[in-house]
Amino acid sequence: MDDFQEWAQEYERVKKLNAPLESLPTQIKRCKDPATRAAVVAPDDKRMLLRVADFVVSVSYSCFDLYRDQDVTEYCTGFIISSDKINKKARILTCDDIVSSEADANSKVFIHWQYMPDSPIEGKLLFVSIHYQIALLEIPVDVHSVMPQLEIPSFGSYPNYGQEVFTLARDKDLFLMARRGTIMRAQQGLMFRSHNILVDYGLPDCGAGGPVVDRSGDVVGMSLHGSGISAILSISTAISCIDMWTNFGRIARPLLEMRFKNVELLDEPSGSRLGGFIVDRVDIDSTAWELGIRRGNVISFNGHCSTPLPEFEDFLLSYGLAHLQGKHRVADFKLKVCDHDEDVKRHINLCVPFSDVSEVGLDRLTAASLWLGSYTFFFGNVPTTVICMLNCLLYLQTFVKSVAGLVL
């Protein structure tokens, strides 16, 4: 009986050796994200994107789900933009989803990176800008000590209309996803500001905050999405904000209280002979409104006529930098204003103050206030009672913190 059992075991072992293999190295495994395979076809594109992908991370944060009435963990994407070898710290750029109106900005934010053995690691929020929809995080990691052979990707120039670009994202399992598309010659959607440009791919749910890469492998922007629309923030704008905050602790921008469109994107033949920016919106009671600037006017700032809006935004930030350096107390622009219908031109001086478009250490109430301000900017006025109640709560919160500080 023992001999028979030994023979049966040997028979089963040999049978398994001769069985057909179900998983061969040459077989294509089932794709988790078919859109990624469709986006990256050429081998050169794959190699190029993988070099950037080394620095793409997943960012997790807690937020309150109104429908389920409980805290949940959400994910977005970020990417490493710098590493400090001396202080052993790295900075990560991501979107402002981590401090949205539903998120508690005082809750912990975690960074998931495939090269960190103790991943996830808690990230420190340095600042957030609701205006530019960016957030800067810091982690106690020296990238070059973890992976000495890695080189942080270079930053490219402004993304251009009609340009083909890729974007990268990582989900909660660190699975890499890619999308490919073309920058659209469409005007900005309701969820985005003048300096954002639209793109024709759809981002995955975790794709906001990921890098946008051109065909040369340079990072040219950061991905944003809202209401099913994908957009790009120019990397030059993000870096300008980071440099300004690093050196001065603030991000100064002229308070124009206007939104613009590029006149070159007009479908009408007159778009070719007019130079400047179309005023898409001007706030009532603003300085521009008092000077007679209205929706539909075509204006140029200090001779800037045909500048793409992302480049124009950097021009405005250069005024903010000069202000922080003590060169300007206010922003003084020389405008040429054209009436689109009547072709009437006039020259005026627009003098406006600066605003700080960065926030540090937001709590849930302050984030709600900023969200309400963004809602008002995009969709119009909200009930005055709501604004008054929120302001009262903010003042009460400040008073309580002051009293608590005195007691302590």
Regions found by a protein language model. Give the residues of each.
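C-terminal cap/linker of serine protease catalytic domains
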Residues: 2-19, 23-29, 45, 215, ...
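Conserved PDZ fold ligand-binding element
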Residues: 88-93, 216-220, 224, 288-316
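PDZ/PDZ-like domain segments forming the peptide/carboxylate-binding groove
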Residues: 77, 201-211, 261-301, 305-307
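Catalytic-histidine neighborhood of serine endopeptidases
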Residues: 6, 18-35, 48-55, 75, ...
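C-terminal, low-ordered peptide segments at domain boundaries
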Residues: 145, 151, 332-392, 399-408
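Short glycine/Trp-rich loop-beta-loop segment that forms part of the substrate-binding cleft
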Residues: 2-12, 16-19, 98, 110-117, ...
